[in-house]
Amino acid sequence: NFVEEHRSFFEPLHPSFFELTTAMAFRYFADQKVDVAVIEVGMGGRLDCTNIIHPDLCVITNIGLDHTQYLGDTLTKIAKEKAGIIKEGVPVVIGRAQGAVKRVFTMKAKEKNAPIEYARENARYWDMEIVPYSKLQEIRPMMDNTIQSMHEMIEAMDEQSEEEANQMRQALLMLDLSDSLRTLDQILDKRKDAIKIHNEMFPFGLFTELSGAYQFENMFTILKALATLTRLNYNIRSQDYRAGLANVCQLTGLMGRWQKVHSYPDIICDTGHNVDGIEYIHVQLNAIHKTFDQEIHIVFGMVSDKDISSVLELLPKDATYYFTKASVKRAMPEDELMKMALEA
């Protein structure tokens, strides 16, 4: 109905599939009267069709060499395109950025009078680690024991000082341990590895079902963005942090991000397709290989407009490879991919 209603407007413009579906999404959000819409840029930023909105917050994630034929062949050129989403007076959070890339964002934010924050600036206040499923199973009873000990302390205090006991009860409420247990149980039910994030605010940790090493950078960006939204009077509670991070895939439909699709043997699916993404995958594969001395088998395919040679150079040399071609026009034939791999 949407397309038919607006056909006379759209046809002279010859919109792309992405432009048309973006317009449909905006209409759907408006009709549903959503409280918050998270709009992801399709590519770049400055010229992207999503760049007509006036948001409460802009977020620019980590800059990598991708879509170089459209955005430019250097990180600085790509950063200038990304910086095009920075709006007059609208706060902006930047993921990993340094050197010339950071200067691009800083200058653009100054030009637009936009408050700017870098996610990495507060990284020292957060500890993060990848926790295997087996280790998560050990953490669960430890948390139970901690809660039990605190309740026993409160009961003992009640006999001596009601005021101190009430203070301890308040501290227990602030820690919100029952909610921590609930979200940990949700991840345990999925039989997944997790990333544990903790600091003074969350001493028993936040757990996210995303366990790719590259998610560390994303977590810093998320936490900074949530803190900024809180300052903008968004009512984001500690249990919202926990529930959101523990159920990312269910809430968003996210797939293919270091996604374990089978155990014994472990089968992991990842859609990394540029040098930055593959570097993280390479590090994590090496860690698995060294820790568990497991053989690695890789089913590998790419589209032809990516920097395939640079990606192949990063992949482990001692793995067994199965080259494949996806059912899309841009996919590189498997025999050509294998030839490039042998030369890498």
Label each PLM-derived region with a short phrase:
Residues 1-53, 69-71, 99-100:
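ATP-dependent carboxylate-amine ligase catalytic core
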Residues 31, 36-41, 49-51, 55-59, ...:
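Nucleotide phosphate-binding/pyrophosphate-handling subdomain across enzymes
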Residues 45-47, 54-112:
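Conserved catalytic-core segment of NTP-binding enzymes
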Residues 95-96, 110-136, 185-186, 209-212, ...:
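Beta-strand->loop->alpha-helix junctions that form or flank phosphate-binding loops
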Residues 98-104, 108, 192, 266-268, ...:
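C-terminal helical cap/extension that packs against the catalytic core
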Residues 136, 143, 147-150, 165-168, ...:
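Generic L/I/V-rich hydrophobic alpha-helical segments across diverse proteins
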Residues 156-166:
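Charged, low-complexity interaction regions
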